[in-house]
């Protein structure tokens, strides 16, 4: 038999929904939107890394940051 601990008693409410599934699609469309946004973010980072996204109009200078 499992031993009851104080930490287990604190975490038990987080597991109270175990086995219950929301009917329908639930939050799947929201997850899809965030996955798409994350993919676009990674694509932009990859293009900057490969220099295929030209950023010549942005001048980066440490003095412009006021440091």
From Swiss-Prot:
Q: What membrane topology does the UniProt entry give?
A: Single-pass membrane protein
Could you list this entry's UniProt keywords, alphabetically sorted.
Membrane, Photosynthesis, Photosystem II, Thylakoid, Transmembrane, Transmembrane helix
- Gene3D superfamilies linked to this entry: Photosystem II reaction center protein H
Q: Where are the transmembrane segments?
A: 29-49
Superkingdom of origin: Bacteria
Compartments (UniProt record): Cellular thylakoid membrane
In terms of one coarse class, where is the protein primarily found? membrane
Q: Does the keyword Transmembrane helix apply?
A: yes
Q: Does the keyword Thylakoid apply?
A: yes
Output a single Gene Ontology CC term carried by this record: photosystem II
Q: Which InterPro entries does the annotation name?
A: PSII_PsbH, PSII_PsbH_sf
MF term (GO), any:
phosphate ion binding
The processes (GO biological process) annotated in the record are: photosynthesis; protein stabilization
Its assembly, as annotated, is: PSII is composed of 1 copy each of membrane proteins PsbA, PsbB, PsbC, PsbD, PsbE, PsbF, PsbH, PsbI, PsbJ, PsbK, PsbL, PsbM, PsbT, PsbX, PsbY, PsbZ, Psb30/Ycf12, peripheral proteins PsbO, CyanoQ (PsbQ), PsbU, PsbV and a large number of cofactors. It forms dimeric complexes.
Q: Which family does it belong to?
A: Belongs to the PsbH family.
What is the role of the protein in this entry?
One of the components of the core complex of photosystem II (PSII), required for its stability and/or assembly. PSII is a light-driven water:plastoquinone oxidoreductase that uses light energy to abstract electrons from H(2)O, generating O(2) and a proton gradient subsequently used for ATP formation. It consists of a core antenna complex that captures photons, and an electron transfer chain that converts photonic excitation into a charge separation.
This protein's name: Photosystem II reaction center protein H
